[in-house]
From Swiss-Prot:
Domain named OBG-type G: residues: 165-342
Residues covered by the Obg domain: 7-164
High-level lineage: Bacteria, Bacillati, Actinomycetota, Actinomycetes, Micrococcales
Family, per entry: Belongs to the TRAFAC class OBG-HflX-like GTPase superfamily. OBG GTPase family.
Binding site for Mg(2+): 178, 198
Keyword Cytoplasm: yes
Protein name: GTPase Obg
One annotated Gene Ontology cellular component of this protein: cytoplasm
Domain OCT: 357-434
Amino acid sequence: MSGITLPEFVDCVTVEFSAGRGGDGCASVRREKYKPLAGPDGGSGGHGGSIFLKADTSERTLISFRRKGHYSASNGAHGLSRLRNGARGKDLEVSVPCGTSVYDEGGRQIADLVSPGSCLQVVRGGTGGLGNAALAGYRRKTPRFALLGLPGQKRKLRLEVKSIADVALVGFPSVGKSSIISAISSAKPKIADYPFTTLHPNLGVVQSGPYRYTVADVPGLVEGASKGIGLGLNFLRHIERCSVVVHVIDCANTQQDPISGFNLIEKELSEYKVAENAIPLNKRPKVIVLNKIDVLQTKEEQDTLLYLQSVFKKLVTDVYAISAVTRSGLRQFTLRLGEICQEYPSQVQPTSQTILIPAKNTPEFSLDRTDGVYRVTGKKPEKWILQTDFSSDEAISYLAERLDRLGIEDALVRAGATCGDEVEIGGVIFTWDPSVANTSFSLSV
């Protein structure tokens, strides 16, 4: 039909997420009448906004990510005088379809957002910098500096939608899968008499007797689907979560051997790699449906149907001859599917979140020397570098004290560092001078 544009179905995208930067702390001094310097009153910066993914039943595809491939949360506001802390950056909540799996750049699965409302923080906002009021202490009564806010996390993630259905209808193109799901549920897929009419999974809810379950009409598979031929991997992905596999066979097609076709589809299912703790696709409960019996008119065609039923019953317990057009055999077929779905557990397995507890004896920094430069790496020292305003000598002195308390100066002495050697921390190069009072580092220019 001309003049109609079907909505695009997108089930795999790569997206960049950037959390908000933390606001800078404020360095200010309270001034009162008769007390021109009444003490520090600089507020701290607000934390940057974080980004969350949330499973939403109103979303069906990832097409919105195709149009917008980068999401950013807002920054935290800077601190102000009179002890006014900066406002926190606004968090960003991004909706995704239920059944969205999230992977990092290395291909490791981070989460599986299956249940409606399930939420995942993908990037965390940067910490706001402390104002000079928070930095004041017995050594520094009135600091003339504040800490800078930290940048927010940045990540590139791959999102994949896998249909959440109890039953998957599989088979070659044009065997009548869309007609079946239209007949047994309220789903209204596009139906036409040519191959690859269905280009994305159609989901339908079936109510048969006391049973209620969901069915997915998976686009037609071809030989080599498990290796990606004919968008096979994209299609097979949507079968991963199903409990029951229904092979739909066109018993009126005289140009294709139904038995060899069944074996070929089974081979593709067996070669598709599922999650480690999931049942292989070819090992799950299966039902064979011989569709389009309304087309069979001659005695020869009827005899062929009986022959196919006898052959397939040797391979599979449940074999049904149906017609999606006349609805013949659908009642018995849908009731049996309900029984199987109730008997076998769902393959939907949300990813559990693991909390990693750091080892007690993990060193807080490491020191090595390459190309004549001592390089210090570690979460704390690199974080402190980002927090330092290098235009302030007092801020640099404060940084040096923190590095010294962490044990970096002693480590440099043990490593054989001498006055004038270069030390790199977090991309910033210092000149080490152990003779300088109160600080062992001077910033190289």
